[in-house]
Amino acid sequence: MLIPSKLSRPVRLDHTVVRERLLAKLSGANNFRLALVTSPAGYGKTTLVSQWAAGKNELGWFSLDEGDNQQERFASYLIAAIQQATGGHCTTSEAMAQKRQYASLTSLFAQLFIELAQWHRPLYLVIDDYHLITNPVIHDAMRFFLRHQPENFTLVVLSRNLPQLGIANLRVRDQLLEIGSQQLAFNHQEAKQFFDRRLSSPIEAAESSRMCDDVAGWATALQLIALSARQNNHSAHQSARRLAGINASHLSDYLVDEVLDNVDVSTRHFLLKSAILRSMNDALIVRVTGEENGQMRLEEIERQGLFLQRMDDTGEWFSYHPLFGSFLRQRCQWELTAELPGIHRSAAESWMEQGFPSEAIHHALAAGDAQMLRDILLNHAWRLFNHSELALLEESLKALPWESLLENPRLVLLQAWLMQSQHRYSEVNTLLARAEQEIKGVMDGTLHAEFNALRAQVAINDGNPEEAERLAKLALDELPLAWFYSRIVATSVHGEVLHCKGDLSQSLSLMQQTEQMARHHDVWHYALWSLIQQSEIQFAQGFLQAAWETQERAFQLIKEQHLEQLPMHEFLVRIRAQLLWAWARLDEAEASARSGIAVLSTFQPQQQLQCLTLLVQCSLARGDLDNARSQLNRLENLLGNGRYHCDWISNADKVRVIYWQLTGDKKSAANWLRHTPKPAFANNHFLQGQWRNIARAQILLGEFEPAEIVLEELNENARSLRLMSDLNRNLLLLNQLYWQSGRKTDAQRVLLDALQLANRTGFISHFVIEGEAMAQQLRQLIQLNTLPEMEQHRAQRILREINQHHRHKFAHFDEGFVERLLNHPDVPELIRTSPLTQREWQVLGLIYSGYSNEQIAGELAVAATTIKTHIRNLYQKLGVAHRQDAVQHAQQLLKMMGYGV
């Protein structure tokens, strides 16, 4: 819940001086990316900009305090301010900020700018007191903001110092409007106007000018002069002489003498007590100060000129001038030391009554009241956790004694979930074990089950599925149905374990249950996770169309709940890319993989390994080995600089081994094979994948017998576990083994099985990646004309993809090849005496590659009748009558030239 006053522009008071000369300068702010107003405290920055902002509807205002150094809080208020300025235009960004569903501030801002691209009118955002920001992550994000904000957007920053926003670069590019303390200082005319409005008796212009010079135009000093003159009935000039040369760092003594000591005791106590509030309203004042009418008292203090300012148009929220507020808080610590904890407790109670637990925690911490802090956390901590208020929660839990946590074990559970969210897995188990050992009395069974659900999640994340399954089952046996969050966690973990074990049907059922529970209770990240797992399971079962449809539901969930910037979004676009690759939709697969990299752009480069692997796969399927090598260099660098799940390593090794196969790099394959550990099992898709990598390397090295043993065992496991996509891949690799070892009948048998299974999986690229050896076999099957209709259609499609991407169309019949062929001693006499033209050689190459007449015409960009003429001529020159005879003749020529066909 956002505090309204932080989003309200300060009210323009009637007695303030209108700074016409500065307003004229600010009138051109829309021509700049950044308008920067800097000066020490008390020079009128906020007053000036609030005057300029008056009447501007499309302007948001964000007043900072120290708590805004938390990234999530900063983002929530900034987006809310822009929503006020645009009338709710940026709904997606708002939802992402409210639910903390973004990877980083920069990625949230990127989404914001996408929405603002449709906003065409001038737009302003004012950020006041930016000097309070000390978080370098926020500085980095705001530099990104300034670089990429729309041209019609102006950021206005008010700060006591020069902010770390790349000011020099903006200044050089003439994109910066600056107003500093020298310009903000009152001139003689403005000082005269000021005193005329504040003092009951007018003063001469010369005297006014002299006082202005004495304090160097410092607005706060002028205000103090007027206040002192009213309270003490002595001349304003006497006050001016006291303030001459003074600055903010030496102001405390003056404020004590001239302000605090000149108000009655009641007002003094009111000022000191209320100053602990960063912002205040009637209810807060009544509780903190004991005044019966807080609103009336606030308005009275405002009328007395005691540096209190309204924060919104309704007049409900107030705050002290930062300089005066800081002074009062310091004095409060000195003068009301004994009362201060009680004052903070009262403030916390009032904030709680108004529904602001984060502010209440701030005061409970300041009060040092562990019991109050504990009670707030027991009632509100999980909501704060779900809204990613992690830093505040961590600070709060550290402030509680361990005994208090033991007395309230759900707070121990909260602390453990905080550790889990930060990937501190070993600390989670240590904390829970210590708590179980030291909790007095018998531990509640439900709480123990919640501990086990969390432990199960930690175990699966840490690569320990056996322990994860044991703990998840224990949790589910003991958790009541009402404990939905822990039941969702445990059910999800159990489903994931069964997926790892190859029990796909039961795993799918549990993931569907997880989705239903998560949707019902609005636990959206687990709903998305369960959909991703369902899609992976369906892919493994060979039901790729069902996997596609599940992915569509996941994309819809991401859109509806604004989950675009969760890291899980990358997982979804990655498995979509895998599916598109399988179906030979390579351009779409590449685009999807690149979008996954974009989702992870703010994370460590190692997180991009899987998507980079897919980019290599796309290059390999296209036959673009140069590009594949370039991408592999980066991939291998990442492999050497990270610790990865076996699934990630298996996928990365797959593209490396395929690349070595396509380039004949036996040395690299042999070296990899020597150092690669062999998995103990092959009961899931990633273990099957790594064994397949081993078999492919063995085939490349001519180690056919051990490779065949591996593949036969993989097929047995795949059939028993219904890992149909893996079976399809295994059959294709077994086909290559048989083909290369000269067992052509066996090769044809398993290829027919693979084609039949592809009717279910839809695989195309898995065939294409095997290149010319696959093309030759498919040509033969097509020429036999015995394939069922679906297999025939798929074989023709695969052949077209191989011809398109691997450039086997007529590469063997180029001019250089033909010249060498004609000079070969064994060339048939018919070809030597009646040579083909270059175009006829090209046509022969395309016939050999399986092209129809229409496809040849399209490839060579000539009429179909012209192709028929070329075919008739080359048939006559070769002495053949049928297409199949021409293919066999071309194959004989290639063998004669030493090509392994």
From Swiss-Prot:
Q: Which domain of life is it from?
A: Bacteria
> What's the stated role of this polypeptide?
Positively regulates the transcription of the maltose regulon whose gene products are responsible for uptake and catabolism of malto-oligosaccharides. Specifically binds to the promoter region of its target genes, recognizing a short DNA motif called the MalT box.
- Which residues are recorded as binding ATP? S39, P40, A41, G42, Y43, G44, K45, T46
Q: How is its activity regulated?
A: Activated by ATP and maltotriose, which are both required for DNA binding.
Ranges for domain HTH luxR-type: 829-894
How would you summarize the oligomeric state and partners of this protein?
A: Monomer in solution. Oligomerizes to an active state in the presence of the positive effectors ATP and maltotriose.
Q: Which GO terms describe its molecular function?
A: ATP binding; DNA binding; DNA-binding transcription factor activity
Alphabetized UniProt keyword annotations: Activator, ATP-binding, Carbohydrate metabolism, DNA-binding, Nucleotide-binding, Transcription, Transcription regulation
Q: What is this protein's gene name?
A: malT
User: Is ATP-binding set as a keyword in this record?
Assistant: yes
Where does this protein bind DNA?
A: 853-872
Source lineage: Bacteria, Pseudomonadati, Pseudomonadota, Gammaproteobacteria, Enterobacterales
- NCBIfam families for the chain: PRK04841.1 (NF003420)
UniProt KW Nucleotide-binding keyword: yes
Question: Any one Gene Ontology biological process term?
Answer: positive regulation of DNA-templated transcription
**Name under which the protein is recorded:** HTH-type transcriptional regulator MalT
UniProt similarity note:
Belongs to the MalT family.
